[in-house]
Amino acid sequence: MKSSKKLSCILIIDDDPASNFFHQNIIEELDSKVNIQICQDAEHALEYLVKKSMFSEFRPMPAPDLILLDIYMPGMSGWDFIEEYNKIRSQLQKEATIAMISSSSDPKDLLMAEENTFVQKYIPKAVDGIHLKSWINENYVQQ
């Protein structure tokens, strides 16, 4: 059953520019009106989220409905991001759904994602993006 949640902004957090480009194209195919923000590391993503809330009255910075989060990045990992995100949630205008998106085939990563209360979905990176497409279609109404 399709959800009635609207998807107006997605924040992609991934250190790989090719993956970001690929995921951006997949999302735009599904919904050309969705605002896509990209951060190539978790530190900048946290800064974006906090500043978005701090300056929302002065500057239109869209708050994400969905965060697509890579697990393995230099510096702060996706798991570290989730820990820090939990600390700043009260400062945010709205909470985003977090989906881990990774090429990791380590079963521990899948298990950690399933056990983490902040991660709604673990989406394997695929050459055709089929997992991401179907999950977005199942969970969000396109505008």
Could you say what each language-model-derived stretch is?
Residues 73:
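Receiver (REC) domain active-site loop signature in two-component systems and cognate sites
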